[in-house]
Amino acid sequence: MVALLLFPMLLQLLSPTCAQTQKNITLGSTLAPQGPASSWLSPSGDFAFGFRPVEGNTSFYLIAVWFNKISDKTVVWYAKNTDQDPSIVEVPSDSFLQLTNDGALSLKDRSGQEGWNPQVTGVAYASMRDTGNFVLLGADGTTKWQTFDMPSDTILPTQVIPCNKTRNKSLRARLDIDDYSSGRFLLDVQTDGNLALYLVAVPSGSKYQQYWSTDTTGNGSELVFSETGKVYFALTDGTQINISSDAGIGSMADYFHRATLDPDGVFRQYVYPKKANAGILGGETWTALSMQPQNICHAIVSDVGSGVCGFNSYCTFDGTRNQIASCQCPPWYKFFDEQKKYKGCKQDFQPHSCDLEEATALAQFELRPIYGVDWPLSDYEKYEPIGQDDCGRLCVIECFCAMAVYNQSTSTCWKKKLPLSNGNMADYVQRTVLLKVPSSNSSQFMISTSSNKWKRNRKHWVLGSSLILGTSILVNFALISIFLFGTYCRITTKKNIPLSQASSKSQLPLKTFTYKELEKATAGFHEILGAGASGVVYKGQLEDELKTNIAVKTIHKLQPETEKEFMVEVETIGQTFHKNLVRLLGFCNERAERLLVYEFMTNGPLNRLLFDNSRPHWNTRVHIALGVARGFLYLHDECSKQIIHCDIKPQNILLDDNLVAKISDFGLAKLLLTNQTRTKTGIRGTRGYVAPEWFKNIGISTKVDVYSFGVILLELVCCRRNVELEVVDEEQTIVTYWANDCYRSGRIDLLVEGDDEAIYDIKKVERFVTVALWCLQEDPSMRPNMLKVTQMLDGAVAIPSPPDPCSFISSLP
């Protein structure tokens, strides 16, 4: 009976899989990529050392250390060839790794040819430890070699990186998530005692430019990941400079920790819950506790190299908590390789030939404005002072010019040629990028070429060209004029009121739909997306090649007031284009029917996301707040005429499939003339969001939108409506009052109680609340403009303490 009980235990001890969990790995032990034993485990099984397949590649394996108990088996170390050749060791499937009887660790192929070894001898045994360190030891227990001394892109708790003597004591980012080749970023523990992040050349690793550092000096400094989960830079005088933090979310017993220099150049500290569904930050996934630098898109502006992203692309955040940098191509450009976006973008059209005459170039190319994006240091010529039309013309006619950048406030123009570098999307960018692309009459991005100045100049250029070329252009112009005149006649015969004034002011060509077209597109106005005072919004789909989803707003009960709202909406949004404004695709003005056709927003209005049972991530709310602010900045300061929205509320902020915020519903908007700062109008807007001056006999300005934005900003911070009658504490009924009380008492944390992400980022929470209180000042002159608001939200300027707002709250009758 005893023998029967012991027999299963004996089989288990002899099992090759179980044998790999022993503390010491003896001489003669062997691993094979596809054999019964492909890895050696640490005693707890938390870590493994051995052969790790590369996702999406079945031709070779890595020699690696990885987290063994989590689903994605995250790799924390991988073997490289030599210091002089830091390329990864690619292991064919027929190879084997052996701790040989003569005391060496050796990778060999089927023929016995050695492919890699760590260049040490006299090894008595090896150990895969629960710290994630794989160690080769001598008979006396001394360390001969260890992975902690040869870091790849990650450090683990208890790991220390001393002052750099050779390159492999630094961290080198991967080229991409699934590409373990040496990447474009380096974290260097320097001999001068400075810890610095560098942009580097691929594949050589030559340093380009430092983009973050501790600015410290002194031999003997070291980068430490303590056993308590704290990452810091230790100086010789005992000073500790915190690089990242454990954020107090739990003990080391509850979470796996790592700090990685990611492929986007950010050094992040991550945690992962050891038990399923035990993560405070939600889910079985790696969550970033902190990162350096805070904004990689803004951190790198390099004289050489492409910047964070590849050439001719630009960097933007993905809006998640981990703030992964995402690379995008500008319009009419495409990635060289969609799977390897770091390679950059190329023009998706035939480039401008230098053999073209000026008039031909003007006919073949046009400019498209892009807002909130910049490519610093790529300019080769500068003009000042100059108008925007002339700035654009000079780029269009020159074959070297890929884009022009214009600063309205200084009347400065920069011309840029390919390749473009250091591209980034930034809230503070106030310049307009004019991208040169092939001419298209149907372009929605086209800069108006109908200005009198541009027309006069074009006339002179055509007259100055050859007779044959001039004749060709005149013929084309005549044909286009006939087409436009015919279109105009067709439109005006179908309409009861003229829209020529609105459309002539618009820089964007709007499509005119028939009522039958929209009735068919909406399946008989079947699916309702929402309803308001003046009409209902339906979901539809166009019968184009892309089967474009649309939102169709119907204007009911056609009266002078609703007719006016329809005209205002067409005139206002029809002349705007910005990533944070909903795009008007067209309209129907047939007999008594008034319909507006918009791009469809997948995630609906903000109130649906914000006031649902599940709270959106803090970084998502930050991303939305910055987007709304950016949209208002465009309306107030960057349009040809200032636009006051007058009815901003969560229902009028829509979210696309990437949760990018877009301002909508311009039916109550007011246009200000160039010399106007205020306008008189009746009370507009929604209770709870309207500014105090609406109730006074004074003109209103863009500051009414600033006030409404302040209310929405607090709703985004607190994840609750401005007025909540069903609250336990009566002082919390009105969020504007409550936020002011919390700010004055130094208890901002109460506004985000239970929101661990926001609590961790409490300084930004305080900054946002402070900005909101400035926006809520009763005196409009005390409120900042939207340029100042975006700067304060972005942390670009200091924010003084706001005065205590007046007790007037527009949410009350």
UniProtKB/Swiss-Prot annotation:
It is found in: Membrane. One of its GO terms (biological process) is response to other organism. It catalyses: L-seryl-[protein] + ATP = O-phospho-L-seryl-[protein] + ADP + H(+); L-threonyl-[protein] + ATP = O-phospho-L-threonyl-[protein] + ADP + H(+). Residues 1-19 form the signal peptide. PROSITE patterns: BULB_LECTIN, PROTEIN_KINASE_ATP, PROTEIN_KINASE_DOM, PROTEIN_KINASE_ST. Disulfide bonds join 297-315, 309-327, 329-345, 391-413, 395-401. Residues 523-797 form the Protein kinase domain. Induction: Induced by infection with the fungal blast (M.grisea) and bacterial blight (X.oryzae pv. oryzae, Xoo). Residues 22-149 form the Bulb-type lectin domain. ATP binds at residues 529-537, 553. Involved in innate immunity. Required for the expression of defense-related genes PR1A, LOX2 and CHS1 upon biotic stresses. Required for basal resistance to the fungal blast (M.grisea), bacterial blight (O.oryzae pv. oryzae, Xoo) and the herbivorous insect brown planthopper (N.lugens, BPH). May be involved in several defense signaling pathways. Involved in the promotion of seed germination. Required for the expression of alpha-amylase genes during seed germination. Involved in resistance against the brown planthopper (BPH). Interacts (via kinase domain) with ADF4. This is G-type lectin S-receptor-like serine/threonine-protein kinase LECRK1. It comes from Oryza sativa subsp. indica.
